[in-house]
């Protein structure tokens, strides 16, 4: 079983029709042994995006994506570890800290800074539909 940590930049591509959406969907559905995980931060970020942009973000689509992801509780240790991932923005640092804590096999992200920090931490990155996709 491959554990794939899904960050918000990737999850939003599953609810919006953007250039990488089809490639991401194809990649995530290509392997039956891939288990999607994320922290509860994903829930917050996606619902906030839907609230801020209701004309663009369908709440039912958000719920469907969240239903397909195993959401993991944040710990104090995650927040402390996130502080060591400078210069990442706080939410990205939290996502990286949780991905590392749960032993994710890969992180699915389209955030350039998070891509760099994840690779530096030894975590393989998936960004289907981009030049940086491995």
What does each model-identified segment do?
Residues 1-38, 52-60, 121-133:
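Short, well-structured N-terminal submotif of metal-dependent ribonuclease cores
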Residues 2-3, 43, 68-72, 100-101, ...:
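Acidic, PIN/NYN-like endoribonuclease modules and their adjacent C-terminal/linker elements
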Residues 6, 37-38, 73, 90-93, ...:
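Short beta-strand scaffold positions
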Residues 10-11, 42, 78, 95, ...:
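Alpha-helix capping/helix-boundary segments
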Residues 23, 45, 81, 116-117:
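Phosphate- and divalent-cation-binding pockets in alpha/beta enzyme and binding domains
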Residues 37-42, 46:
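Substrate-recognition element of Asp-dependent hydrolases with the DxDx(T/V) motif
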Residues 60-86:
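Acidic catalytic patch
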